């Protein structure tokens, strides 16, 4: 449980930093920025899950690939399916992360469901968004809520293992 909480909090901080960069630099939503954002975010997630297996570098590499593929999938599918495809992509990255975490696919599915619901619940955090106010604290808490079910599912180990 401790690893799940630490992971969710760390990656929530990375996501909040990403929100700050997008807002603080007034970045327009361009494919190259989205690809970079997804790659860096999932590089961090992969590194964390990899570190739990003492394969940090490989986890980071796989995580970066997952993030790039996820962001690329979003940008390919969004013009056809709309922005709601973001929920679909978000859900399926957890199955890929199960591989990085060394977790069974079933736990990837549980992570997909739990974190998918969490992401759906927090998905309105950008509207309205006040980058000068307390919104970053709300973003951090919201991201923690969205990530925690996935981290719980993927980092849980039965007693004695």
Which residues fall in each region the model found?
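Juxtamembrane/disordered regions of integral membrane proteins
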Residues: 1-161
């Amino acid at each position: 449980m401790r690893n799940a909480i630490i992971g969710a909090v760390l990656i929530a901080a990375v996501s909040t930093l990403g929100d700050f960069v997008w807002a603080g630099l007034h970045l327009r939503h361009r494919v190259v920025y989205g690809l970079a954002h997804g790659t860096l975010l999932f590089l961090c997630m992969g590194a964390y899950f990899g570190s739990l297996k003492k394969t940090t570098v490989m986890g980071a590499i796989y995580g970066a690939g997952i993030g790039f593929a996820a962001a690329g999938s979003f940008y390919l599918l969004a013009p056809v399916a709309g922005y709601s495809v973001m929920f679909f992509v978000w859900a399926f990255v957890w199955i890929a992360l199960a591989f990085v975490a060394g977790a069974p696919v079933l736990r990837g599915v549980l992570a997909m469901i739990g974190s998918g619901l969490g992401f759906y619940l927090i998905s309105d955090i950008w509207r309205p968004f006040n980058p000068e106010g307390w919104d970053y604290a709300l973003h951090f808490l919201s991201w923690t809520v969205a990530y925690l079910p996935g981290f719980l599912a993927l980092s849980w180990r039965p007693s004695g293992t």
